[in-house]
Amino acid sequence: MSSSMSTLRNQFLIAMPHLKDPNFEGTISYICDHNDEGAMGIVINRPLDIRLSDMLAQLELGGEGIAMPVYSGGPVQIERGFVLHSPLGDWQSSIEIAPDICITTSKDILEAMARGVGPDRTLVALGYAGWGAGQLEKEISNNFWITCPADSAIIFRTPDSEKVVSALGRVGIDYHRLSSISGHA
């Protein structure tokens, strides 16, 4: 992370319209960590064709009837599960990213969700988005991404199709007016 750029932890990373990478085209990611070694985030608007009840059944945890979608969190370690949630709770492997947003990777949170006693707000993802040292900063300087402050309501309550527009609207940007052509002044 360059000294000219502060951490992007607890920020949204929104793909510019000209970013045609199939892993990120049209996405909004929540940045969970960002430091000198790189960045890690979860794509929050790409539901998979799988429901949480299906995943819980595959893990033999029960949870029948939970219609919540499971998301494609990114192209790295797509077999690994991540749960963004609020409030923090007492799970084996949780990190508080912001006062109202945590990430957990341990199975105990899924067990609690299957029993109906999990966190109030959740987003379950398989895989994550990762960037090496300096990679994300370079992509931002090349106009592939827009960053803006994260909002838990967008993660947990906003329909997937509205997340990008809602996040940009919070900082006064009209997504529909963004150009699909990039450049530098």
Swiss-Prot record:
InterPro entries given in the database record: AlgH-like
Superkingdom, taxonomy of origin: Bacteria
GO cellular component, one term: cytosol
Pfam entry (one): DUF179
Family as reported in the entry's similarity comment: Belongs to the UPF0301 (AlgH) family.
Protein known as: UPF0301 protein HCH_00550
Gene source species: Hahella chejuensis (strain KCTC 2396)
Lineage: Bacteria, Pseudomonadati, Pseudomonadota, Gammaproteobacteria, Oceanospirillales
